[in-house]
């Protein structure tokens, strides 16, 4: 049970930080802190595509993966409602001028990078016991946010888009982008899965 609570709490604060600030440094450092907080309990996934990568690399079974993802999505929804209570009435992720093709390329590339970094710093035997894993993961998100934040919103995490997408069915203004509310979560899910699967199989077949 502790693992699922940590996944919910970690995802909650990650989504909350992203929703309340667009500063890539704050987001990256926030993620790093959350990773250090939960790594020894749940592995600190906070991201369905990270859980998918761990499943592909035999670190977690299917039943456990589903429970992790349910916890992450719940944390996302609670975070969005908390943002509203704090006065944040919109969640603008994708630029209204972004082309869908550019969005897909940006999200796939940097989701791949994020998952590949996580697999290497968390699973690689030569780096076992390292203390920089949290910073490596957080700084990867920071680099991605600076690089493609204006193109895709630099989400790299379907859980981050799940809460706003669900709420946007109630109020379409919650998500400020050129992507319709019905497609918002689906697009991030597709790009996340593609990036994660590519990184996972490359790591498993070549670098593990």
Briefly describe each language-model feature range.
Residues 1-208:
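Membrane-interface helix-loop junctions and terminal tails of multi-pass membrane proteins
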């Amino acid at each position: 049970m502790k693992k699922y609570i940590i996944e919910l709490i970690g995802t909650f604060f990650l989504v909350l930080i992203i929703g309340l600030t667009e500063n890539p440094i704050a987001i990256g450092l926030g993620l790093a802190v959350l990773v250090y907080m939960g790594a020894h309990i749940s592995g600190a996934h906070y991201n369905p595509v990270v859980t998918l990568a761990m499943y592909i690399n035999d670190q977690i079974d299917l039943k456990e993966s589903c429970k992790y993802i349910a916890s992450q999505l719940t944390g996302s929804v609670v975070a969005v409602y908390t943002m509203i209570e704090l006065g944040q009435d919109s969640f603008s992720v994708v630029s209204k001028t972004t082309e869908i093709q550019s969005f897909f390329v940006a999200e796939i590339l940097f989701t791949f990078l994020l998952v590949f970094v996580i697999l290497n710093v968390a699973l690689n035997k030569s780096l076992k016991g390292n203390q920089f894993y949290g910073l490596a993961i957080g700084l990867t998100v920071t680099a991605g946010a600076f690089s493609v934040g204006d193109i895709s919103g630099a989400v790299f995490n379907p859980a981050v888009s799940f809460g706003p997408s669900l709420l946007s069915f109630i109020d379409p203004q919650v998500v400020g982008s050129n992507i319709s509310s019905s497609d918002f979560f689906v697009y991030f899910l597709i790009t996340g899965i593609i990036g994660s699967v590519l990184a996972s199989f490359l790591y498993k077949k070549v670098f593990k």
